Structure formats: C-alpha cells, structure tokens
C-alpha cells in the first residue's frame, strides 16, 4: 500500500509554516492517540501522523522529501528496515532504471564510470537491555567493513609505480559491443571490464588491496544510544559506511536496535505498565503500597473497595520520548489476590464476615450419598 503524502496526512499546504505544522500535529495526535481513541485503526493513524511530523518538522528532511518524495534519497519513516533479523550488518542498495535498461539492451545509456559515487550504506544490529534503551548509553561495537587501503591510499596501484593506458579499451573507458536482441542486432557501448571505465590500468597492482583501493578490516566504533529508543528503531552514523568511489562520499552506517523486555514493566511506546497484586484486606479497606518506577519507588494510594482490573495512571512516569516530545505515563494494573491457605482463625473470621454480609458459606464438601439424601428429602 502506497504511503500518503505527508502534507495530506497533516491536512496542511505544501508551503505551511513550522507553527502550522506543529499546530496540525498536536491537534491530530491528540485526536488519534491510542490512549484516547480506542477505535480500530487509530494506532496506525497515530503512527502515520507522527511519521509525517518527524519529517516535515525537520528542515533538511522536509527539503529532501519535497525533492524526492518517500523514495529517496534514503527514504523516510524511521522504521526503514522492517522486522527482519539482520544478524549483524550488511551492505544494501539497488539499481535504478539505467541498470535495468543496461541489462536488457546490453549497455544502453551508461553512467559516467569516473563520476564520484557515494559508498554503500551498512547496517548493524545492536542488542540493548531495557534499561539501556530507556536511559541511553554509549557502547563500543566492532564491525568488518571496507576501508580505504592504507598502503596505496585508495589509488589501487603499488606505491612507486604508475598507471598506463588501458590496453583493452585504449584509454576510452568503454568498449563497443554488438548483441542480438528482440529489436535485432544492436551495437552498444559498455564500461570497459578491465579498467572499469577509468581508461587506465596498473603497471603493478597494490599488494595489499590487489588494485581495489580498499581492504576489509575490523573497525571499532563508539555508538551513543539516545534515551527512549524502542525495538526496531535505528540511528544513522553519517560517513561510517563503505568508502566512496572516485572521490565520492562514504556511505552511512545504520544501527538498528533490538531491545530485551523488562522483567518488571511492559512497554508500549513511551508508556509502561506494572502489575500490582493486592490482598483482599488491602483492596477492601484501602492501603498505601510502595511500587517501583523507572527512577525510584513511590507510594501508591489504593482506595477502599478497589477491584481487580482497576488501573491507576501516574503521569510522566514513563519513558522519555526519543524525539524529545516529553515523557510517557506509568499505568498500574490491580489484581486482587484470593488467599489459598487460611488458618482456622482466619477461616472463622471470614465466616463471620460472610454472616455479617448476609451470606451463608458451606465449606464442607459433601459426597454423592449425602447429596442424594438431601435431594429425596426435598432439601
């Protein structure tokens, strides 16, 4: 399903000011927030609104979106890597129309092989504990990636040697090829397979990188994890991808987070949930109970007559929003626990309570014979 235009999502014009964008976002996010709107589809609508605001409220992202739309140059939406298990890191990219045209006609239009090209982007999967994701942290990672060859400094030739005119294409950087196609015999030009379009070849290739200009090494990087990141979210480390070609910029490294669940809380976005068991006397008479929060412990007042399923909301006791939109809430869900083992004295008190409440409790199990006698006696 195609994404809707971000301006359409927020109901604003393409020349809307920042204040108009913010005003539209606040109005719509309040209307479709999952805690307020329980209608089907409200959650997805809220995510769509948040995604649109994240892009349009940022000058650089907005300018890029206005120029390229949803599909470029890096795409938008924060969650760009689905839920797949990446298992470490890998390069990613893809060909455009020119590549398809080239493969079909045996050449066709060719990009300038000597033009600067950005290096490949990489992805790395980082596992975080619940606490690391909530409070942020700094972690050192080790990845294997292509880096500029230290021996030849990316030139590809052995130091002290020079390059010469390519013997295959005579320095043209491309060669003529004739192929049979559905349109008949077609003569096209292709990038020279020997010099890759440079028009030159080495007298002697670099002994370290064998002419590639890059070598694969293990690199250590320090990654600053922001507060409030959630599972499947990612951050971009600009320039930490593969080296560029022909003087082009390096690609980027995308760090995708896998967050382990908490043993204490259940997370839903920026909100967290805590299950609190209370005894029958506490629920009936009321009490003050100490409960955990993300930073410390607080006293929660349980009113008399509290029932199972009652939920208490502690505002802004949740997780800090990763984009800086305040804090989520802490929800405490109550479960009244029925005692399973009672002393004789406790049983007497419970029976007395039942009698005062007008209830008759028969806690003596009867066998089939006794039940049959009472049945025929009309009891």
From Swiss-Prot:
PROSITE patterns: DNAJ_1, DNAJ_2, ZF_CR. Gene3D superfamilies: DnaJ domain, Heat shock protein DnaJ, cysteine-rich domain, Urease metallochaperone UreE, N-terminal domain. GO terms for biological process: chaperone cofactor-dependent protein refolding; DNA replication; protein refolding; response to heat. It is found in: Cytoplasm. One of its GO terms (cellular component) is cytoplasm. Binds 2 Zn(2+) ions per monomer. Belongs to the DnaJ family. Homodimer. This is Chaperone protein DnaJ. The gene is dnaJ.
């Amino acid at each position: 399903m195609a994404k809707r235009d971000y301006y359409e999502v927020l109901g604003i014009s393409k020349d809307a000011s920042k204040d108009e964008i913010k005003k539209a976002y606040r109005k719509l996010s309040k209307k479709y927030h999952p805690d307020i709107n329980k209608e089907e589809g409200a959650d997805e609508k809220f995510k769509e609104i948040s995604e649109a605001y994240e892009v349009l409220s940022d000058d650089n992202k907005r300018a890029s979106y206005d120029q390229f739309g949803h599909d470029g140059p890096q795409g938008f939406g924060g969650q760009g890597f689905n839920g797949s298990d990446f298992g470490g890191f890998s390069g990613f990219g893809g060909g455009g129309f020119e590549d398809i045209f080239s493969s079909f006609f045996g050449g066709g239009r060719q990009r300038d092989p000597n033009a600067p090209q950005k290096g490949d982007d990489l992805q790395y999967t980082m596992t975080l504990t619940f606490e690391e994701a909530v409070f942020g942290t700094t972690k050192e990672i080790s990845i294997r990636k292509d880096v500029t060859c230290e021996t030849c400094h990316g030139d590809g030739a052995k130091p002290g040697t020079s390059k010469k005119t390519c013997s295959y294409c005579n320095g043209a950087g491309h060669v003529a090829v004739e192929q049979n196609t559905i349109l008949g015999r077609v003569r096209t030009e292709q990038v020279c397979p020997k010099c890759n379009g440079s028009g030159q070849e080495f007298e002697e290739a670099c002994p370290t990188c064998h002419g590639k200009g890059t070598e694969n090494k293990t690199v250590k990087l320090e990654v600053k994890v922001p507060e409030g990141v959630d599972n499947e979210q990612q951050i971009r480390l600009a320039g930490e991808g593969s080296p560029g070609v022909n003087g082009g910029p390096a690609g980027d490294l995308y760090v995708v987070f896998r967050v382990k669940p908490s043993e204490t809380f259940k997370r839903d976005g920026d909100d967290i949930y805590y299950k609190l068991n209370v005894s029958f006397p506490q629920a009936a008479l009321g009490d003050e109970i100490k409960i955990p929060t993300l930073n410390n412990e607080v006293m929660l007042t349980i009113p008399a007559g509290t029932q199972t399923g009652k939920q208490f909301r502690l505002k802004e006791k949740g997780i800090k929003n990763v984009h800086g939109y305040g804090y989520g809430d802490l929800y405490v869900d109550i479960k009244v626990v029925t005692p399973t083992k009672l002393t004789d004295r406790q049983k007497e008190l419970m029976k007395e309570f039942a009698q005062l409440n007008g209830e008759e409790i028969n806690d003596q199990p009867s066998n089939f014979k006794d039940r049959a006698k009472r049945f025929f006696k009309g009891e």
